[in-house]
């Protein structure tokens, strides 16, 4: 049956997409779920955590006279203008005020903080399945509430769509070695092959239990492949991108078991771990001929731009400094509702 919610390939022609809004409430450093991440942060990053504690992006004026929300939304608008050139339908979630989050989830969730910019992680569309994911950090759990209204609207005007949810984890404390965890930044839809990135050991993001859950849910129709990535890599989409069939951007040194066999005989643009810090793999295909790539003050990502252009791909560059400083970029900020390869 025809559906207006459908994704078949990472590089299918993009027709409908959700872009997050740059509203974030930064958590209190005393929250246990935040303290466990301190060991991964530099001194400068820790100072930023403490200076932003309890504030929203509308209350942070580190680059006066504009606040962080305004700076990030300006970058979003540049991205949106590109989508408009291709007649892509855009959805934006409503802002979730602290009072609503407190009412729905409790004071502890507000204390832990929450994010609304990076729409990629709370859910994924595989075929005509909308799958709400169970994220590993409490900071990412409340935001799914803002997408449900969009889902309801789309389903009311679609046919054959399945909307399901992974098992939800009610507590702020979780066992990352037992509870199934998945985040959209670790999932790539490539026809009947689904790649799921997991980090070895005590996963900070998606884990093996999450991979097994997705494999069992999708069944024999899909081949779900686990991709082991090195500790320190936030998500699979920080080291992998598929601009079109036969062409992949990846960081081979971040792949524990080497390049997945799915990409045998493909043209590979291999990036270093240092390049991956500039989020040059976190771009977004509009279709197989057009690609959006971010850059910032430190990482211009010019080499990747030239590599893609030399292969006939038109690259749109978007300045994304204020997103990149929070380890997010173009793919993180967008979640396709409709993508389909045109034959």
Where are these regions (language model features)?
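The feature marks the mature, well-folded catalytic cores of soluble enzymes
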Residues: 1-343
């Amino acid at each position: 049956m025809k559906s207006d919610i459908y994704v078949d390939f990472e590089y299918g022609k993009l027709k409908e997409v959700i872009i997050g809004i740059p509203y974030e409430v930064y958590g209190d450093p005393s929250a246990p779920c935040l303290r466990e991440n301190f060991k991964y942060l530099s001194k400068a990053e820790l100072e930023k955590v403490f200076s932003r504690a309890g504030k929203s992006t509308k209350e942070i004026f580190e680059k006066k006279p504009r606040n962080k929300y305004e700076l990030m939304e300006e970058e979003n608008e540049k991205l949106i203008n590109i989508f408009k050139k291709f007649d892509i339908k855009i959805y934006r979630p409503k802002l979730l005020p602290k009072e609503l989050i407190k009412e729905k989830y409790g004071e502890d969730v507000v204390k832990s903080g929450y994010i609304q910019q990076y729409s990629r992680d709370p859910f994924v569309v595989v075929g005509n399945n909308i799958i709400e994911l169970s994220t590993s950090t409490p900071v990412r759990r409340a935001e799914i509430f803002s997408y449900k209204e969009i889902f309801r609207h789309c389903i009311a005007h679609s046919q054959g769509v399945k909307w399901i949810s992974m098992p939800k984890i009610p507590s702020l404390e979780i066992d990352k070695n037992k509870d199934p965890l998945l985040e959209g930044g670790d999932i790539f839809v490539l026809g009947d092959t689904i790649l799921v990135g997991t980090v070895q050991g005590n996963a900070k993001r998606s884990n093996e239990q999450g991979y097994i859950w997705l494999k069992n849910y999708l069944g024999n129709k899909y081949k779900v492949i686990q991709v082991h990535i090195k500790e320190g890599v936030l998500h699979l989409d920080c080291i992998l991108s598929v601009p079109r069939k036969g062409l992949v951007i990846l960081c081979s040194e971040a792949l524990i078991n080497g390049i997945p066999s799915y990409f045998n005989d493909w043209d590979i643009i291999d990036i270093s771990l240092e390049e991956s810090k500039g989020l040059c793999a976190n771009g977004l295909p509009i279709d197989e001929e057009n690609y959006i790539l971010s850059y910032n003050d430190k990482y211009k990502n010019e080499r990747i731009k030239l590599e893609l252009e030399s292969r006939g791909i038109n690259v749109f560059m978007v300045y994304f400094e204020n997103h990149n400083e929070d380890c997010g970029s173009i793919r993180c900020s967008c979640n396709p509702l409709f993508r389909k390869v045109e034959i």
